[in-house]
Amino acid sequence: GSTAEVHDNFRNQAGAFAGTMNAIRLFNEHGIQFLINSSFTKRNQAEAPKIYKLVKDLKATAWYLFMIVPTGRGEEIMDELIQESEYEEMLNWHYDMEKEEHDLLVRPTCAPQYYRVVMQRSKEEGEKFKRRTLKFSTGGAKGCLAGQLICLIDVDGNVLPCSYFPKAAGNIREQSFKDIWENSQLFLELRDFKGYKDNCGSCEYVNVCGGCRARAYAMTGDYLAQEPFCSYQPGSSLTKTETTKDSQ
């Protein structure tokens, strides 16, 4: 949140905001670059523009907007997840903000639909949208990277598609990482967009978006199911000319 009242309520811990501000003050005093991560639910989604201003005032190097994946402690706030239509509005707000931002690196995280929004909006506006990158930044080229460009190895040796995905592709104590990465059924399925279901399976943006596989798994029990937070209907962004050609 942008204030102690909102932030401490969201974190469920009095003094959390003051502690964060003190840490940032120390970073600035010693010339240490830092980024700020913000998680958004119904409770604080209206705060995004205010948090953006605060992040700028605090001289952060980057701001990552995390869209909740209801795994782990996230399962406890399932009823606070942002609605599909409001989620879309927030991503469009981010696009407008990022397009005008030249100093701060900004990233919507666990929001693969944003890459579809970028393609849609830039095409509609006839503008090439070049996104900023930093040496330590991840993403920026496509949506969900889980099991495609990234993975995670936990303390027990389990190889997971990402930190939000509880299903393991294998264990490095039992087989080589190379074998897991190249041959595990889970990773192969995540990389095969033809196996994605419902809207994701027929979407023209699946290659750049892919939907959040961890969120699909958490909310439906099927990691190949359509992205639960996406309201886009496949084909709806095609021009009349393109639609006519496809029907001929």
Model-derived features: where do they sit?
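Radical SAM enzyme [4Fe-4S]-AdoMet core and its adjacent flexible, acidic
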Residues: 1-146, 152-156, 168-169
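Flexible mid-to-C-terminal extensions adjoining Fe-S/redox cofactors in radical SAM and related proteins
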Residues: 158-159, 163-248
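Short hydrophobic/aromatic beta-strand element in the GNAT-like acyltransferase core
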Residues: 149-150, 200
